[in-house]
Amino acid sequence: MSTKAKSKKVNKAWLHDHINDPYVKLATREGYRARAAYKLKEIDESLGLVKPGQLVVDLGSTPGAWSQYLRRRMSPEGAAAGELNGTIIALDILPMEPIEGVTFLQGDFREAELLEQVLGVLAGRKADLVVSDMAPNLSGIHSADAARVAHLIELAIDFAQHHLKPEGALVAKLFHGSGYDELVKLFKANFRTVKPFKPKASRDKSSETFLVGMGLKAQETL
């Protein structure tokens, strides 16, 4: 079988699984932009991370499913268009369709220009929660992919160290495989409590998992 034929077969199988995915159907029915909303929902329902009145930063927010979930949880009635009680800042290098009540800033948060905008919205405040669904474009080369995943985790932790309350939490996506244990150690070096979490909404075939770090350790003690 040619490479082109194999690729076509894989794409057809993925499309079949996607169409029949119960979380895809649920997301469509409930108005979420992606099934990823249910991953954060499961983590939140298990650990009670999201509360009305919080300041939350969503890293790698596009297409916006996590911001949508945060928006609904932080509305008194849980409604998509209800009055927002809190602040949600969404960041991504890609564009994102607006979500009422969510402040979206497009760009790289490592760059001074965007960071100034973030600081302007924070207005001297620290975040209660930072969530990161950031993921690199995977190449299939394990060593290269592991390095890319590690880099994004390091960026999320660094952002949390600078902008998260001491008692706050960070939720970040990573993948089982090369470098996973080192990233768990990195989380433990930065947070007092670390919990791994594999939501039911993550596809069975996926190595995707999440780490939740709670209680930020001071930088000088690292």
UniProtKB/Swiss-Prot annotation:
Q: What molecular function terms (GO) are annotated for this protein? A: rRNA (uridine-2'-O-)-methyltransferase activity
Disulfide feature:
none
Can the keyword Lipid biosynthesis be found in this entry's annotation? no
Q: Where does S-adenosyl-L-methionine bind?
A: G64, W66, D92, D108, D133
Name of one Pfam family that matches:
FtsJ
> Where does it live in the cell?
Cytoplasm
- What are its GO cellular component terms? cytoplasm
Which InterPro entries does the record associate with it?
A: RNA_methyltr_RlmE, RNA_MeTrfase_FtsJ_dom, rRNA-MeTfrase_E, SAM-dependent_MTases_sf
Q: Which UniProt keywords apply?
A: Cytoplasm, Methyltransferase, rRNA processing, S-adenosyl-L-methionine, Transferase
Methyltransferase in keyword set:
yes
Protein name according to UniProt? Ribosomal RNA large subunit methyltransferase E
